Amino acid sequence: MNKLFVLLIALLGLTAAMRDQSIAVKGRLLCGNGPAANVRVKLWEEDTGPDPDDLLDQGYTDANGEFSLQGGTAELTPIDPVFKVYHKCDDSKLKPGARKVKLALPKSYITSGKVAKKTFDIGVLNLETVFAKEERELLVSRRRRGGFNADYMDPDNSEKDQSKSSEESEDKEKTVETF
């Protein structure tokens, strides 16, 4: 019984030591002389050891190549924020997958709390640049209804997804009217 009590107290102490930390990043991506529109960007917190990496936020660049991401997590130690870009700029059509660029973000922009109080402006990046330690992403999780990556929207099929959802809502309305 005493061992269980000690374990419970230790777990409560560990939980209390966890602190909310957050970060935000914004910028603009180019592909040559023009904006890199609909480029997938993600904000990660990378962990070492058995603790899995945490996806803090994700999205796509707008028509001007601009993005803004922010997110946070509870960690015992300071977070290691990383910004990732997945793109096909200046890429051979024969190569599979997308180019993956990973940039570490300055720890000075980490703030306490669930909402970031400071935003790191990464500036303008031209994706024609070959970055050090650049990788390729060969597998991409696609949208599954209500499952993992349910918020994933493929920009190439966004019009199809929107028309499908409007058709589904029209079918539901027709069903309601029938009964």
Curated annotation (Swiss-Prot):
Q: Name one Pfam family in it.
A: TTR-52
> What are the alphabetically sorted keywords of the record?
Secreted, Signal
Subcellular localization, as worded in the UniProt entry = Secreted
Q: Taxonomically, which superkingdom?
A: Eukaryota
Region Disordered: what ranges?
Answer: 144-179
GO cellular component entries: cell surface; extracellular region
Q: Which residues form the signal peptide?
A: 1-17
Where does the sequence pass through the membrane?
none
List compositional bias (Basic and acidic residues) regions by residue number: 157-179
Q: Provide the family line.
A: Belongs to the nematode transthyretin-like family.
Q: What is this protein called?
A: Transthyretin-like protein 46
Natural source organism: Caenorhabditis elegans
- Encoding gene (name): ttr-46
